């Protein structure tokens, strides 16, 4: 029940955001209510997604899940859940600020407005990243002691990528606060890559006593892969065409 609600609530959240935009000037109250509703729905979706991801890594909790097959089991009582959830939400705010700056970097505005908007987006990114550092440390300290030790030097690969992510993330925060847009983008991409690998390392640690990747049998399905690539390329072509048409209309309207 709770899980399947993600899909309709995501659709409703998109509708609410459109209402917020369309009614921003004509009906400020409705616009604010729509924005608040969209935020609540998105927070709920994040809550369910984080609960599901946590459940995936904790086979010892699966018995409770199988006892409630209707989708009413929420794996949110684990000690890592709250910092994990906040880690997810705060990082979304940070990337949102960076996306805001990226949009205005390419938007045709006056130089003053464009630079001010980029600076504002970078400040949002920097502040959210500062909070993310605190939340990340909290999350790390809630992990089992053996996992912490692996990230603190016992596992060289895990330690290397965690350290790389922390250094690049801190660097991105500093460059964002000082208004260095392109450097911030590059450091953020490096941070994301390092943290994705770190996340994978943590998942392996959780599942190590229950499952090993080396136990899997590899059965390549080249036909399915080829079909996926064809559809991917076709989709990118369609999206590229849509963007081209949209930008051409915008330029004609501006002219």
Q: Model segments located where?
A:
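Polytopic transmembrane helical bundles with strong interfacial aromatic enrichment
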Residues: 1-255
């Amino acid at each position: 029940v709770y899980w399947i609600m993600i899909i309709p609530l995501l659709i409703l959240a998109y509708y609410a955001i459109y209402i917020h935009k369309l009614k921003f000037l004509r009906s400020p109250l409705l616009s604010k209510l729509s924005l608040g509703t969209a935020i609540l729905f998105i927070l709920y979706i994040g809550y369910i997604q984080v609960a599901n991801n946590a459940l995936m890594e904790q086979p010892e909790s699966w018995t409770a899940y199988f006892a409630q097959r209707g989708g009413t089991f929420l794996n949110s009582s684990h000690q890592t859940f709250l910092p994990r959830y906040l880690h997810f939400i705060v990082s979304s705010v940070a990337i949102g600020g960076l996306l805001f700056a990226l949009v205005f970097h390419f938007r045709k505005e006056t130089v003053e407005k464009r630079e001010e908007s980029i600076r504002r987006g970078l400040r949002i990114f920097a502040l959210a990243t500062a909070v993310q550092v605190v939340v990340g440390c909290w999350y790390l300290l809630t992990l089992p002691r053996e996992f912490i030790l692996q990230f603190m030097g016992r596992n060289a690969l895990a330690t290397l990528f965690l350290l790389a992510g922390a250094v690049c993330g801190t660097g991105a925060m500093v460059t964002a606060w000082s208004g260095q847009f392109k450097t911030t983008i590059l450091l953020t991409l490096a941070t994301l890559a390092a943290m994705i690998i770190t996340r994978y390392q943590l998942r392996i640690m959780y599942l190590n006593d229950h499952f090993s990747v080396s136990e899997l049998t590899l059965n390549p399905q080249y036909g399915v892969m080829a079909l996926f690539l064809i559809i991917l390329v076709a989709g990118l072509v369609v999206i590229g065409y849509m963007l081209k048409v949209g930008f051409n209309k915008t330029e004609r309207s501006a002219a």
